[in-house]
């Protein structure tokens, strides 16, 4: 057996190769290592070999030749580092229209994960629809989802987990070029951030989560929910306002996320 660590090296990464056998004792055989037909190492029982991978899209052909007792065995290893990018976003996570960041998932959110292979072979790039994708979730292979041109998946967060670990194996149709990428998606609690509108009914985009000092006049507070899993923001979210632990009832037709606070002074 030939053990390559890591199995999917990145560009210029150090790679360790080890030969193992259950039938012969390799410690009593001369093992010669060559890279692209140039000998790099040779010795009795030289089962281990280290090498640095090349740039993305490059290929190194490593041959381990085992000699002894009138027997010659060759093992071929190809190092062809490739890269892939994994992108993710919560589909049903609510954020305000002015929010420019990523939609983060909360409990039981729907999450879309997409893979982008950055393969280069002979100066040609691998097309998204000409690759094979195998998906793993929390170290368990996802069945009936991956395959040819299946470059994205949608999962629902398991509420018993604090994060979702997703791994994708990407290869060309001949399985001669491969890459593996893992991403850990954190699950966060929904949040509420506070804003206010000025006298011209203009909302300040900076939050006032640390408090707001009002010296005169009234202030219109705005509560903005973030990262709630909801299909219909308008109907799925309920608001309950309290001041000093006393429930307030808003006037019919008024915005349920705004509260006019009058300054008695």
Language-model features, listed with the residues they occupy:
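Solenoidal tandem-repeat scaffolds enriched in leucines and small polar residues
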Residues: 102-171
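Surface-exposed, flexible coil segments in extracellular/virion-facing regions
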Residues: 34-51, 136-155, 243-261
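A short beta-strand segment in extracellular, disulfide-stabilized domains
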Residues: 11-22, 104, 108-119, 123-124, ...
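Conserved structural position at the C-terminal beta-strand
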Residues: 64-68, 170-172
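Short, compositionally biased P/S/T/A/G/V-rich stretches that sit at domain boundaries
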Residues: 1-9, 76-105, 183-214
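Exposed beta-strand face motif in extracellular beta-rich ectodomains
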Residues: 58-62, 162-166, 219, 265
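Solvent-exposed loop segments of extracellular immunoglobulin-like
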Residues: 25-32, 124-134, 232-240
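Short, surface-exposed loop/turn segments at beta-strand-coil junctions that are enriched for proline
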Residues: 52-57, 156-160, 260-265
């Amino acid at each position: 057996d030939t053990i390559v660590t890591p199995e999917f090296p990145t560009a210029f990464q150090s790679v360790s190769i080890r030969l193992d056998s259950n039938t012969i004792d390799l410690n009593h055989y001369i093992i010669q290592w060559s890279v692209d037909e140039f000998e790099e190492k040779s010795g009795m029982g030289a089962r281990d070999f280290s090498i640095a991978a090349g740039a993305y899209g490059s290929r190194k052909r490593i041959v381990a030749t085992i000699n002894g007792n009138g027997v010659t065995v060759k093992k071929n290893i190809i190092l062809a580092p490739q890269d892939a990018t994994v992108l993710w976003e919560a589909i049903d996570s609510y954020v305000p229209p002015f929010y420019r960041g990523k939609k983060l998932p909360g409990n039981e959110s729907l999450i879309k994960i997409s893979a982008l292979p950055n393969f280069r072979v002979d100066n040609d790039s691998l097309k998204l629809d000409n690759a094979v994708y195998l998906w793993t979730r929390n170290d368990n292979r996802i069945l009936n989802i991956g395959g040819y041109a299946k470059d994205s998946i949608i999962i629902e967060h398991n509420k018993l987990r604090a994060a979702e670990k997703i791994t994708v194996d990407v290869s060309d149709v001949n399985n001669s070029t491969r890459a593996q990428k893992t991403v850990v998606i954190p699950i966060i609690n929904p949040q509420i951030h506070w804003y206010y509108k000025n006298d011209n009914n203009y909302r300040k985009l900076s939050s006032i989560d640390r408090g707001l000092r009002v010296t005169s006049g009234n202030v219109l507070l705005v509560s903005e929910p973030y990262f709630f899993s909801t299909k219909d923001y308008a109907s799925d979210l309920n608001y309950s306002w309290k001041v000093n632990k006393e429930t307030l009832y808003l006037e019919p037709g008024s915005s349920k996320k705004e509260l006019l606070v009058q300054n008695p002074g």
